[in-house]
Amino acid sequence: MPVMRSTVQLIGLLIAGFCPVSYTYAYGALGHEIVGEVAATYLCAQAATEVEYLLDGESLGRASRWPDWIRKDPQWRKSKPWHFINVADDGRIAAVTGRPGGDVIWAIDKFSAELAEQKLGKLRRAEALRFLAHFVADVHQPLHVGRREDRGGNRIAIVIDGRKSNLHKFWDAQWLLKLDRSSHGYDRDGQIAAIRALGAGQAETLQSAGVLEWARESQALRPAVYAFSLTGSGEFDEQYRASALEISRLRLAAAGIRLAGKLNDIFCTQAGQR
C-alpha cells in the first residue's frame, strides 16, 4: 500500500521535527467546509454541474456540514454509527466493516451508490451527496477509525487552553481553530488556500487509494495520536500540538482531493469526461 506508507513516513518526519509546522484545526464544522471547498477545485465540469444542481447552488463545503446538524433528529438517530468505525490497533478493518447499524466505510459505499442512481430522484441524491462529503472527511480523522475501549478518544480527559475536554475533541472540535495563532486564524479563505496548497500535485496519487486504504491510513496514525504526555495542568506540550495539527492539515487536504475523486468517478465517467 504505497500511498499509506508514504503518508505514514511523512507523518513520522513531522513528529521527529524535520518539517516546519503551522497551527490549524481538525474536523469541526469549518474543517468539513474546507474539505468540501478543496474538493470543489478538483471537480470535472460535469461533476461541478451536478453538485450545483443537487444542492441548489449551496456550496459543497457548507452542504457537507448537514449530517452533524441532523444527528439529534429522531429520523436520523440511526446515522450516528455512520460517522466512525471501531477497530483494534492490529485489527483488519475489512473484517469489521459492514456490521449491523453501519459504519463510516459502509456509509461511504452506500451513499456513493445512491448518488450514482438517477432513479432515486433529486432529494434522495442530494442527501446522499451531503452524507458522502461528510463521511469522506470523517474517515480521514484518525480517531474516527478508533479504539472501542476509549470510544475513539472520547474517554481520555485532557485540558486545552484551560478548558476540560477529551482527546477526540482535540482532533475533531471546531474550537481547535483557536490554536492557529501564527497564520490564518479565523480567515476562512486563507485556511482553504493553505490546506489546498498541501495537496498540490498529489491528486493522482491520493485518488489511487480506495476507501479501506483511507481508513488504514487513519489506523496507522494511531501511535502518533496516542504518543502524548500531559503537563501538570493536563495540557499537551507544544511539540504534540504542533505535530497533531500538522497531521490534521495533511488529512484535510487528502480528504478534499479524494472526495473530488469519488464525485468525478460518479459523474464524469457517466459523461465520458474521464
Regions found by a protein language model. Give the residues of each.
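N-terminal, motif-rich segments that launch catalysis or mediate targeting to/interaction with membranes
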Residues: 22-135, 142-274
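Bacterial N-terminal signal peptides
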Residues: 9-20
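Positively charged n-region of N-terminal signal peptides that target proteins for export
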Residues: 1-7
